[in-house]
Amino acid sequence: MVVLEGGGGVVTIGNNQYLQPDYLAPLPTTMDAKKSPLALLAQTCSQIGADSSAVKPLLAMDKNKTKPGACSSSSNSSSSSGSAEISAAKSPSGQAKSPKSSTPISSTATSASLSNTSTGEIKLAFKPYETNVLSHQNQNSFKSSSSLDAEPTRPSSKNSSSAQERVPSRSKSNATPTDGGKAEISAHDSSSSRKTVSPSGSSQRGASPIVRSGMEVLNNANGTAQHPKEMSSMAAAAAAAAAAYKAAGPYGLNPLSALCCPPGMEQHANPAFRPPFAGGFSHHHAAMLAVAANGGYPGGAPGGGPAGQPNPYISYQRIKTPAGGEAIVPVCKDPYCQGCPYSAHTQQMLMGAPCPAGCTQCEHQKYGLAMASAAGLPPAHPYSQAAAAAAANAAAARSAPYVCSWVVGDAYCGKRFQTSDELFSHLRTHTGNLSDPAAAAAALAQSQAQSLLGTLFPPSALRAGYPTPPLSPMSAAAAAARYHPYAKPPPGALAGGPSPFGAAGAFNPAAAAAAAALGPYYSPYAMYGQRMGAAHQ
């Protein structure tokens, strides 16, 4: 244990199991011992690792400082006029100030300035794991440092002439636990500020040659002093956000944003990743999400897969625009991506210029063929022809919304008109024949013959014409294009070809065009033509 004797008081430093500075002796007060750099270094090093909680005053305070008062400072003195216990009645002349009170380690124009500093010493307590910046301030800059009140500071010790007492410094006030917890400090330029006292007491913090600690340098490299807890919390939050962003993949917090289409598309544009209903659970949906999270779905990264392969579902095609120019557009070939703006089907449906039905010279037909070729299929392929027919029928449905649904037996008119007047005038051509008795009798005989066929022959004999509803709008065309597992395929499907999907002869353009009005469904005989033909031979 080391006992440091000062003028009028004794301060003891408690036992420390890590550091026993028994070799230190009280510094002599002669000459300029407190001003020399060696003395400052010795005082600084003696307080490294010291525990401020073990500091206890051994002598009672002086009687003339028992009541708290206001510490008034003169405008011409270099330091403030004492601690918070000095009464306001004392004049600056009554307190003989020594020039030694303005040393670099004295209080920075604050409390605990020494009234008789010839025998007083300032002990600086430094803890390497307690973040605190004690910058060298001018003694006239006290009023500009009020922002440091809420910042916990490093405990320091002050030795005054009348009371040698060591208390931890917590704020810029000047009071001890025996002072009632209040202090009033007057600044040099008549700018006073009232500050509360922390529970453990406070003393004025002074300038110190001690550099920053390692934790502060790491947490606060830009020089702005902040609380270590605040710095650690902000650093933890930033690290957590960065980790979440990196763990989410190259597309930020949503790793599913580019599974179907290029970046910027809707995250659930792919129906494979869309839940079946709100709040429901689907094993397929969960499996697709798991595969996407593991990077197994093609196109899950900007380069495609984990190895950086290009996305197999995205291709670029140069097409002719309706204005006559050329444009390079991305095309999404994902079969599950129907609502994506890059889908060929969506782009075909968006082409809304008027076009008559069956037109092969308009831009719609060329655009459909270009989209089919962009999908990697030749123009003569059944799928390409069906896509072109579907695009043409969709354009015709927008340009001519009025359709004649007149049916006589299995004959369906199906003509389209742009206005209702044209449709009404066309209907007169059908109803005009009924006014003739001979035409009406012929139509009645035809309908009776159709009903007689249905009674004489069983349905199994008419299986090739399945289904044949008598008044179906698409009975004849849909029967040719609709697939039935037991029906004999059309003659064109028997012709084999080198293509695994069947030759071009296995596709019926008329049937595909008729079926395209019902939706983008293609003839199944084009794919299974060879096997079905071999089975029926």
UniProtKB/Swiss-Prot annotation:
Subunit description: Interacts with elB.
Keyword terms, alphabetized: Developmental protein, DNA-binding, Metal-binding, Notch signaling pathway, Phosphoprotein, Zinc, Zinc-finger
ZnF (C2H2-type) intervals: 402-430
An annotated GO BP: eye-antennal disc development
Gene that encodes the chain: noc
Region (Disordered): 64-116, 138-212
Compositional bias segments (type: Polar residues): 138-177, 188-206
Molecular function GO terms recorded: DNA binding; zinc ion binding
Compositionally biased tracts (Low complexity): 70-116
Organismal lineage: Eukaryota, Metazoa, Ecdysozoa, Arthropoda, Hexapoda
Top-level taxon in the UniProt lineage: Eukaryota
Protein name as annotated: Zinc finger protein Noc
GO CC terms of this entry: nucleus
Gene3D superfamilies: Classic Zinc Finger
Tissue: Highly expressed in the adult head.
Similarity field: Belongs to the Elbow/Noc family.
Organism: Drosophila melanogaster (Fruit fly)
Function recorded in the entry: May negatively regulate Notch-induced cell proliferation in the eye-head primordium. Required for development of the supraesophageal ganglion and ocelli. May act in leg and wing primordia to negatively regulate body-wall specifying genes and thereby promote appendage formation. Plays a role in tracheal development.
Residues with PTM Phosphoserine: 98, 157, 208
